Amino acid sequence: MGQKVHPIGMRVGIIRDWDAKWYAEKEYADYLHEDLAIRKFVQKELADAAVSTIEIERAVNKVNVSLHTAKPGMVIGKGGANVDALRAKLNKLTGKQVHINIIEIKQPDLDAHLVGEGIARQLEQRVAFRRAQKQAIQRAMRAGAKGIKTQVSGRLNGADIARAEGYSEGTVPLHTLRADIDYAWEEADTTYGKLGVKVWIYRGEVLPARKNTKGGK
């Protein structure tokens, strides 16, 4: 069977940037585990705040965490109470000074993570898997997507044998490196077990900036 490479990992360094921006030698393993702990903690604390991407940058004894969210008001809280509480907890977790940046996602229907999360939550509320996928596809296309593909796999409708069923609209050129494709997978906990949700969204082409060579050529 043909396997698909991760669309984001394939484009890192070409049109996508890293989610963790730091360099370390001896401390690499410690920093990596710390990053995983930060991401896990933030996703648990802000499970209902539509947080998509968590970017982490490091300086000496300082950690900058950028949260991309569709609900910045929920993350900040009244008078900044929620974000202050989150910062204090992250300071305690890491033992370092943590600075939090909040970046609003203007079009959540073009964010694969949020679209997948929406489908998964609908499946948990017993919405038909075909309907959940088709509604998500319609919203994404209306929001300006050039193409979208979704897939739900597992014991669909409680069937004894697990299977995968997907829908797509428009084009999703997975092999084109300049294609801005957002990808995410989520899980839905249903009474029949877990269902996997995958979403690919093609948002148009991005031409990487030309690198200047010597002589100005």
UniProtKB/Swiss-Prot annotation:
The keyword Ribonucleoprotein applies. Part of the 30S ribosomal subunit. Forms a tight complex with proteins S10 and S14. Binds the lower part of the 30S subunit head. Binds mRNA in the 70S ribosome, positioning it for translation. GO terms for cellular component: cytosolic small ribosomal subunit. Belongs to the universal ribosomal protein uS3 family. This is Small ribosomal subunit protein uS3. Keywords: Ribonucleoprotein, Ribosomal protein, RNA-binding, rRNA-binding. NCBIfam families: rpsC_bact (TIGR01009). Pfam families: KH_2, Ribosomal_S3_C. GO terms for biological process: translation. Residues 38-106 form the KH type-2 domain. Coiled coil: none annotated. SUPFAM superfamilies: Prokaryotic type KH domain (KH-domain type II) (SSF54814), Ribosomal protein S3 C-terminal domain (SSF54821). The keyword RNA-binding applies. One of its GO terms (molecular function) is structural constituent of ribosome. InterPro entries: KH_dom, KH_dom-like_a/b, KH_dom_type_2, KH_sf_prok-type, Ribosomal_S3_C_sf, Ribosomal_uS3_bac-typ, Ribosomal_uS3_C, Ribosomal_uS3_CS. It comes from Streptococcus pneumoniae serotype 4 (strain ATCC BAA-334 / TIGR4).
